[in-house]
Structures are given as C-alpha cells and as structure tokens.
C-alpha cells in the first residue's frame, strides 16, 4: 500500500537536451538560412541533423530552431530542483497515469481497437490521437511508447510510460507495442547510463504540496 500525497503536476511532459534558438539568431546565421532555403525548395518542413540541430516550419510558415546539448540525468534533476520542482516517483507516475486502476491499462486489460493510436497508421484511423487527450486528472500522459518519462526514487532514475519504441520497431504489433504505456509496465532490462537520450527521454515537473508547507 502506498500513500500519494497532494501534487501539482505539469500537464504535458517536456523534451530534454534541446535548447530553443532565438528568432534573431536564426535570421543572422547564414548556414541555417541556407539550410532553410534548400528545405523549402524541396518542399520540406523539417531539417534534422542528429544530436546537433533541428529546424522546423510551423503551420503559419514560420521557421524555428533548436540546438542539441548533451546532458546527464543528475544535471537535469539538479536544474529541476533549482527551480523549486521535483521529478515524480514511479508510484506517483503510476497513479497519475492510472488512478490506481487494477487493470493493465486505465481503460481495461486489452487494446481498444477503435482507438486512433500513434505510429499505428495501418489501423486506418483519422483525426486526433486517442491517448493525446487529457485523462481523468487533466494530464497528457502515457500517450506514446516512443516517449518515456524519467522518474526518480531515492537516488535511482528509471523510465515510465514508454520503451523508446523498441517493441514497435521490433515489429511486435499494437498490443505489445503499446504495453509500455501501461501504468505498471517496468522494463527490468533497461539500462540507465549517465547521459539522457534527447530523442526519447522526457520529463514532467511536480510540486509536492506537503514538502512546500514544511
């Protein structure tokens, strides 16, 4: 039995390692502007150089950019703490995602094939992805197996909410592919090193009300 104390929780998870490029810096950099011009000539809306830079165009035709900066789990945690926040624990994340459900998924023990699931376009569904909607707590959580969230328990980092897309990339299908978004899924073989993988690792800030009242 676990007690989940009152929390203030970030609605959507945040990406790691990427730092926004200012509009002015983007305009002044000739190399980046040449990359944008080349992309536009080819009808592309995004340019990605792995773990270096990402330039992307939004629906209003405006170009934005972000730079990749390698960081560690410990640096991320310290930065979060410096701003008065915390990372959720595994049990806290499970409750935020499942509300204490006794089933594999918050909606039951199997995949609902009427859902529109990301990375499963062969299901021939249109419109908004089902799991990208707010849950019972008003959170977007456990929506994409490629996006695993970093949690922290007494000196130990681990992941919840995804496996980095390993099951889907391995061709295991929709049920096994989406099993990692289950509140209770835990990959015991997943090794956690020192550095964060900015393409797959995300985080969510929380504030523990009891901690702030002491």
Which residues does each predicted region cover?
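Extended aliphatic helical segments
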Residues: 3, 9, 141, 151, ...
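Glycine-rich loops and low-complexity Gly/Arg-rich segments
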Residues: 32-37, 111-114, 173-177
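Functional-site microenvironments in short loops/helix caps that host divalent-cation chemistry
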Residues: 54-171
């Amino acid at each position: 039995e676990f007690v989940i104390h009152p929390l203030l929780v970030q609605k959507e998870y945040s990406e790691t390692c990427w730092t926004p490029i200012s509009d002015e810096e983007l305009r002044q950099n000739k190399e980046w502007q040449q990359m944008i011009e080349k992309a536009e000539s080819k009808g592309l809306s995004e340019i990605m150089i792995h773990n270096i830079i990402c330039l992307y165009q939004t629906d209003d035709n405006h170009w934005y950019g972000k730079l990749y900066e390698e960081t560690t789990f410990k640096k991320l945690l310290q930065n979060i703490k410096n701003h008065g926040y915390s990372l959720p624990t595994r049990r806290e994340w499970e409750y935020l995602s499942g509300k204490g459900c006794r089933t594999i998924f918050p909606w039951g023990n199997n995949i609902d094939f009427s859902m529109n699931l990301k990375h499963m376009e062969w299901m021939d569904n249109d419109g908004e992805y089902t799991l990208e909607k707010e849950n019972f707590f008003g959170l977007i959580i456990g929506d994409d197996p490629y996006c695993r969230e970093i949690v922290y328990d007494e000196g130990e980092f681990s992941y919840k909410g995804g496996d980095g897309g390993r099951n889907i990339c391995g061709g295991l299908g929709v049920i096994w592919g989406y099993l990692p978004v289950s509140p209770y899924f835990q990959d015991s073989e997943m090794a956690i090193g020192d550095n964060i993988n900015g393409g797959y690792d995300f985080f969510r800030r929380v504030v523990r009300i009891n901690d702030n009242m002491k």
